[in-house]
């Protein structure tokens, strides 16, 4: 209990250091050892103007305040996280905050939660007055008639043992230093260096556990119902989403079918239109070309000249036709004569008599008969 277990100095990075511990009430999870605090260590987020809560180990507290007496209204010395004033008790700190800083909404760390054992050392709140009223009310269950007595009392369950706040194994005590010396008034300190009664501590811990479990059960009730409601809402949303998806799919299928039919009809129409347009364009182009040729070829002339030219063209065409026909007929006749002559030559080569005209044959016969009459008879054999 002579070290701050689990705590390291954010300036020199020394862990589990001894002596006084100074916790910043503005910066989250920022602690300094005594030497760094006195030397004025700062960072980009921490300055020397930030209020600091001094926390002592149990050994240092026994060394400084062993044997002293404390009244009920003087537990410990706390620092105001808004103005940095020190020396307040729980009651006086609550009165000071409600009177001086009621309208302040800056996020600060509770010095009581940071100093008391079992409290949350980094409990940040933006309504410090309400936090003090709810969590750190003045103790009424102590025996006020005893007046001043030796400090051998337990910390109250509402101050950190009970509830959902995390526990710390080491016990810290606060002090306010004036002039280099630390003077402290503690709400929990073993007077005459006596250890805390283990039975009383166990009972207080059990009561805190019961309260925390009861709070958890009470909080779990509405959470379970809320979970059921959320599940029902999720199921309804899923069903609605599925129905919407089915509707969308049916609509998409219908639109796809309609689009397919429309596309086929449009394709046929477009092809027909393109064909007709292409034919029309071709005809127009042909007509335009004819018109252009006629315009270019036809000279400017009178009707008589045109008629004479047309008659000349007709005569020329007839002449050409007759010429072609005559050439074709001559070729056919010449070819037939040549064929006949060839055949006669072939007969002569074969020993056949040449074919001659009728008049020529008659003349030859007459000549032969006359010659026979003039010749002498042949000699007898």
Curated annotation (Swiss-Prot):
Summary of the function given for this chain in its UniProt record: E3 ubiquitin-protein ligase which accepts ubiquitin from an E2 ubiquitin-conjugating enzyme and then transfers it to targeted substrates, promoting their degradation by the proteasome. Together with UBR4, component of the N-end rule pathway: ubiquitinates proteins bearing specific N-terminal residues that are destabilizing according to the N-end rule, leading to their degradation. Does not ubiquitinate proteins that are acetylated at the N-terminus.
Pathway: Protein modification; protein ubiquitination
Coiled-coil segments on the chain, per record: 223-261
Upper taxonomic lineage: Eukaryota, Metazoa, Chordata, Craniata, Vertebrata
Positions that bind Zn(2+) 1: 9, 12, 33, 36
Places the protein is found: Cytoplasm; Late endosome; Lysosome
Keywords: Coiled coil, Cytoplasm, Endosome, Lysosome, Metal-binding, Transferase, Ubl conjugation pathway, Zinc, Zinc-finger
Superkingdom of origin organism: Eukaryota
Name of the protein this chain belongs to: E3 ubiquitin-protein ligase KCMF1
Source organism: Xenopus laevis (African clawed frog)
InterPro entries: Di19_Zn-bd, KCMF1/Dystrophin, Znf_C2H2_type, Znf_ZZ, Znf_ZZ_sf
Residues where Zn(2+) 2 binds: 24, 27, 46, 50
């Amino acid at each position: 209990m002579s070290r701050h277990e689990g705590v390291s100095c954010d300036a020199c990075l020394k862990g589990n250091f001894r002596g006084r511990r100074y916790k910043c009430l503005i910066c989250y999870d920022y602690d300094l050892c005594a030497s760094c605090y006195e030397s004025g260590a700062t960072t980009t987020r921490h300055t020397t103007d930030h209020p600091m809560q001094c926390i002592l180990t149990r050994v240092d507290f026994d060394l400084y305040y062993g044997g002293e007496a404390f009244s009920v209204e003087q537990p410990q010395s706390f620092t105001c996280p808004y103005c940095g004033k020190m020396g307040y008790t729980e009651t006086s700190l609550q009165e000071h905050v409600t009177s001086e800083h009621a309208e302040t909404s800056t996020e600060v760390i509770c010095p009581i939660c940071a100093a008391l054992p079992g409290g949350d050392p980094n409990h940040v709140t933006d309504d410090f007055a309400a936090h003090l009223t709810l969590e750190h009310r003045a103790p009424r269950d102590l025996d006020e008639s005893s007046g001043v007595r030796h400090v051998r009392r337990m910390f109250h369950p509402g101050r950190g043992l009970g509830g959902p706040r995390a526990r710390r194994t080491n016990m810290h005590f606060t002090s306010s230093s004036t002039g280099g010396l630390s003077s402290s008034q503690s709400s929990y300190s073993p007077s005459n260096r006596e250890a805390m009664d283990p039975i009383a501590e166990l009972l207080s811990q059990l009561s805190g556990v019961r309260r925390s479990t009861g709070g958890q059960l009470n909080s779990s009730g509405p959470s379970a119902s809320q979970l059921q409601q959320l599940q029902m809402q999720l199921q309804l949303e899923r069903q609605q989403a599925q129905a919407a998806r089915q509707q969308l799919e049916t609509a998409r299928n219908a639109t796809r079918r309609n689009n397919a039919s429309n596309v086929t009809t449009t394709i046929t129409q477009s092809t027909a239109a393109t064909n007709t347009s292409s034919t029309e364009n071709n005809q127009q182009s042909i007509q335009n070309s004819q018109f252009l040729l006629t315009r270019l070829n036809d000279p400017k002339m009178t009707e008589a000249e045109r008629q004479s030219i047309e008659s000349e063209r007709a005569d020329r065409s007839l002449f050409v036709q007759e010429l072609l026909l005559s050439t074709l007929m001559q070729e056919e006749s010449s070819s037939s004569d040549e064929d006949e002559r060839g055949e006669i030559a072939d007969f002569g080569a074969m020993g056949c008599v040449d074919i001659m005209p009728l008049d020529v044959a008659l003349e030859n016969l007459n000549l032969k008969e006359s010659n026979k009459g003039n010749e002498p008879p042949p000699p007898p054999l």
